[in-house]
Amino acid sequence: ELQNSGEYKKTFIMIADAQALTDNIENPEKVRQNIIEVALDYMSCGLDPAKATIFIQSQISELCELTFYYMDLVTVARLQRNPTVKSEIQMRNFEASIPVGFFTYPISQASDITAFKATTVPVGGDQLPMIEQTREIVHKFNTVYAPVLVEPKALLPENEACQRLPGIDGNAKMSKSLGNCIYLSDSEDDVRTKN
């Protein structure tokens, strides 16, 4: 809908492979394979590469650079208060040993959003704290340096049931990394055996 609405000048769709490594560091081959699967899923949902720019996060080195600078604008205490980070840490049983890359992924997401001057970011309800944290980073950056970054707005699905899809295990959210999802490429038999 977004790519065809005419409301937005450009649409950027990211395949977040670098972020996927934050909780799959032991399995880089899985992340590599998921790049292809996610791209195919995007296109099977109707994303048109002629209308939307689909890119791979790790191929844009400037995103890492921007993340590095943004890290100085966010405190550890602020990251610890982020409700999305808290719930993700619990879901992945990282309480005792949180990988730094995983802990700081909200800062990386802020880079992913602001690098492209995104005005609108489609998210589920669980991602609202991430957008809020991005807005805080933008505000602080613009105040300290120069008013050059855009404060993005969240775009939630109109259907409230789509704002947070539960996993097939009934817990948390549906997620590839949690292994509790149905893939668009799943056969009918695969879907039945997952129930």
What label would you give each PLM region?
Residues K86-N195:
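Active-site cores that bind ATP or allylic diphosphates and position pyrophosphate for catalysis
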Residues E1-A110:
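N-terminal Rossmann-like or analogous alpha/beta NTP/dinucleotide-binding catalytic cores
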